[in-house]
Amino acid sequence: AVHRAFFVNSEKITKDFYAGFKKQHAAFAKFITGIDDEIDIKNNRNKQWYASVMLNRLMFCYFIQKKGFLDGNPNYLRDKLRECIEQRGRNQFFSTFYLRFLRRLFSDGLNHPKHDREFERQFGRIPYLNGGMFDQHQIERDYADIDIEDDAFVSLFEFFDKWQWHLDTRVTASGKDINPDVLGYIFEQYINDRAQMGAYYTKEDITEYIGRNTILPFLFDRIAHSSKTVETMFAPDGWVWQSLKMSGDRYLFDAVKQGWTPDWREKIPQDIAVGLDTEAPDLLARRARWNDRTPEPFALPTEIWRETIERLQRVDSIMAKISAGEITSVNDFITYNLDIRLFASDLIAKSESGSFIYNFYDALRSVTVLDPTCGSGAFLFAAMNILEPLYYECISRLDEFKDNPKVKAALDEINQKYRSNIHYFIYKSIILRNLYGVDLMAEATEIAKLRLFLKMVAVVDVDYRADNLGLDPLPDIDFNIRCGNTLVGYANEKEIEQDLSHASDILQELANQEFKDRIEQEMQTVAATYREFKRLQLVQEEHFAEFKQAKAELQNRLNTLNDTLSRRLFIATKGDPGELMFQPLFEEWLASHHPFHWVAEFYQIIHGNGGFDVIIGNPPYVGYTRKNKQTGVAVCEIYQVPNSYSTLPTSNLYAFTIERSNILISSVGKLGMIIPISAFANDSMLELQLLFKQKLGETWISTFHQRPAQLFEGVLQRLSIFISNKDDKHIFHTTGIYRWYSENRDFLFKNLAYTVCRQDLQPHLIKVGCNLEVSIFEKYASNTPISTYLADAGTNNIYYRT
């Protein structure tokens, strides 16, 4: 009931706030001067972008001022604006609130560790945040004369002050609560509206389902092979699976178990139970009431008896497998839709092995999770929520095994590296070590970082007696979450080598080898610089000057490396236009294609780890050659993806993204995304289906209709979610097509049922929901089709009477 109340309340809040937010954003941009003022506001992308930058910073400040981090004043910004306006009224030579106050607050205050007495006299006591959010922005570097009129802030703060800003998810009756979850929806909606690129707001149930069924199976696989001791625990008769065998129904979701008891057959009404026997005669007559609505306590919302019986029988089947010890693979948790998060938590709590606890913690510290089209960070946010409790539970147990040298080293690192509290340290570790995202839209990446930072600040309370008000600096993740084109650029060293393999003579061959060696050395240097940059953030005694120098060095080296690779890619794809025309044509190509060189940006992952461990997301559903209805321009007219894409004939960006992800993922990685159902059904997507059959391993596909309810609110789109392993098991598990009502949304993903389906029966990836449907398909495929009995031409006459 509380969850439903929050859902209903937050839905109304998000719609109301978003409507006002859009108006405020449009109005705010009009007050900005000094950014391409000659361009009309509608087409002035940089001015619109800077309006977003400012609103993001100010919303972050609204959250932290309500927690007391801005001089202990919950109305800090509004009061400082009033002071500036009053002073300006008395002295016309005073500059605007933006120039006189905000720019200094951001650069010398929130982005600087030391504040002198003169600063504190004007600004009060505020924390050093770091995080990159208050660094000088690219637009601020490009445009030196930016100013914003005071009226922009008067209107904006009046709008913000109508709402209650807090960093938890409390439910109140005010209908005015703004928290990071609500803001996440608003950001997603805003980015999607701005991008007009076939992206939709992905709700938490989708991101959580995909996240838990990729991240946790990967962690289990890594832990199982971490040491001989732990490997024994994961053997079929080992401690891990014996724990599951003795667990009863603990790991079945409550929604699946609704109304289930071992003797449910005796408890259901007799006129329903009479239809259970499939061998006795008159089956249809005995099941006459199976289409009636199921009453409590057996029913889920909208369920009829036929559906209830199928669910209860499925519980019987799963329970039999658990108690017989037949489930001995982490992938079975996906197949039978068991609560793998609870299972992982229980194993950590119950294990008496220091090796198991340490290796679980070590796997958590090292897993790399990527969203290649991250938008405003919905999937990264879900990944953090999945990882955080496991981090905490492992750390809570480590102290019991501190005699183990590896455990002691891990504890020393933890004890040295956090001041605020353990949860803050965990979030910081996750954001720096585990999460990576790329998006073509710079605004989206900035919002993704903001959402992650808000999650961190939420777990810290202000402490006026402590240094920096008790707040550790936020992590700078400018090199974790990047802006660029996922589809264009060098993914790995193999792609660079392919472009260097077409030498015309021995001199060209030698030059190519020299280029390759130089690039390899530069990439290693960038990776080493990145490791040092990250290390400085994870140590407690972070030195500001040293940190800033490390960041500048990393950025400069990366810029140089990217420029070198982009020039090589431009020549490889467009040819060499000659010295005179090269630079203007190269810059034009650079501006339209925004190449992202994965092997340079994430060398330590692509080269050192063989790719990312987990890739999740919701790629854009956009036709490559289809013209946008609003702009009249097709993607292929803006940039061209390489001809090497095998999925190019599908002509859709989501197919290209999946193919790209298959290259970026490690040989033992997990891949999960939500995409249109057409991916597995249409002739136009055969190349993508071939990729699933030939290059991905064991796969689970669940499918959802657009009526009566939709996964993306208000969007009539039939969708599929796939989870794939990178292995040699070409097994496909599918569900039927789920048609569901909105009141069933809370139970939808907990009630999925998969069936193993042969995929050699037809070219497409067929979707079946039970063994009966599999049998029908097999019979259909094994018999001679009617078409073989039909002749294209015959000698018989046909007479027709009019």
Question: Where is each model-derived feature located?
Answer:
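Preference for the N-terminal adenyl/adenosyl cofactor-binding alpha/beta module
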Residues: 1-386, 434-444, 484-487, 566-627, ...
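SAM-dependent nucleic-acid methyltransferase catalytic core
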Residues: 21, 213, 281-357, 402, ...
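Short, flexible/disordered secondary-structure transition segments
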Residues: 69-71, 197, 221-226, 394-398, ...
